[in-house]
Amino acid sequence: MEPFDPAELPELLKLYYRRLFPYAQYYRWLNYGGVTKNYFQHREFSFTLKDDIYIRYQSFNNQSELEKEMQKMNPYKIDIGAVYSHRPNQHNTVKLGAFQAQEKELVFDIDMTDYDDVRRCCSSADICSKCWTLMTMAMRIIDRALKEDFGFKHRLWVYSGRRGVHCWVCDESVRKLSSAVRSGIVEYLSLVKGGQDVKKKVHLNEKVHPFVRKSINIIKKYFEEYALVGQDILENKENWDKILALVPETIHDELQRGFQKFHSSPQRWEHLRKVANSSQNMKNDKCGPWLEWEVMLQYCFPRLDVNVSKGVNHLLKSPFSVHPKTGRISVPIDFHKVDQFDPFTVPTISAICRELDMVSTHEKEKEENEADSKHRVRGYKKTSLAPYVKVFEQFLENLDKSRKGELLKKSDLQKDF
């Protein structure tokens, strides 16, 4: 893949926003069929420009205005905020207290740095194929709960461009949720609790909630290959001591003896399971199958940035924004192929600009002469960004179908009266 040089970013962004950004689909998403008057016009966008210049409360009348502004500013990063009571770009003219965030998608932000206490391969901003499995498990667990436990239909998963993933839940009813309800949802989805000083972050008992059981079933599919082989979490004393800190002291000696006798993480894990589930230890109310589950959850369960989800007015990085450090595009993820998603094959801005350059001069000239934006944005179709835009379009199709279904229902009800 084309190496990315951050020094070239200003020039690359010009080309990206002029020829490659999927404006039509982007506007179609945030306009939500134009059902609610001024929905798009009251949406906040924020731009981060070169040298960390940050501009909040941007808003636009239509797709064309958004395009012009983005091509003029060439933002390093785009964030999407709430739909407000008034146009965000006029917030200074509104009476104090009257300018209120009214609606926004329910969003989730999962960042690999929050797993630094349990991943051995990388730390801070670094990721590799070994620890990416954490994101796969997180997406599977959260998506299943949003779909089955809450009945949310329209969930867009997006790669952040570096070390994490975001989820946008776009159902109409969800966009109207209060901050209190959002807090309740994120609380339901949170199991790993406590800061750096807290060693044991997951606490279960005999009454295990169905959400937890279903999450454990997902983790089980990945646990051996990810945790026992890939991360080798019981490789040596330093590592098994971390796990001993999560189980009752009454079984420490028995576990230690087995850990010293066996020579691999899978064998040592099997020993831990037997000890935790032995009839002798089960008499101790702290032992049982939930002991191994607590360890699995602490090492593999999603770690959400709670504050991002709670606030209606919280900004989150936009899909199709470019990560200024890696150059990777923040692309939608095809959830049907979530296990195959590889962050290292996500196109960089340098790669897609190069691909565009390789299009014949004749074709380019023909396109440049096309005045209207409908033709100009076809540029992405000639690059490796195309399949990701297709994923986005499929998501939009489902949103449209759902909206039409709701409108038909409403008109049928009115006919009945």
Curated annotation (Swiss-Prot):
Motif interval(s): Zinc knuckle motif: 121-131
One MF term in the entry's GO annotations: ribonucleotide binding
Pfam families: DNA_primase_S
Keyword Membrane: no
Sequence positions bearing N-acetylmethionine: 1
Swiss-Prot/TrEMBL cofactor(s): Mg(2+); Mn(2+)
GO process annotations (BP): DNA replication initiation; DNA replication, synthesis of primer
Annotated positions binding Zn(2+): 121-122, 128, 131
PANTHER family the record matches: DNA PRIMASE SMALL SUBUNIT (PTHR10536)
Family: Belongs to the eukaryotic-type primase small subunit family.
Name of the protein this chain belongs to: DNA primase small subunit
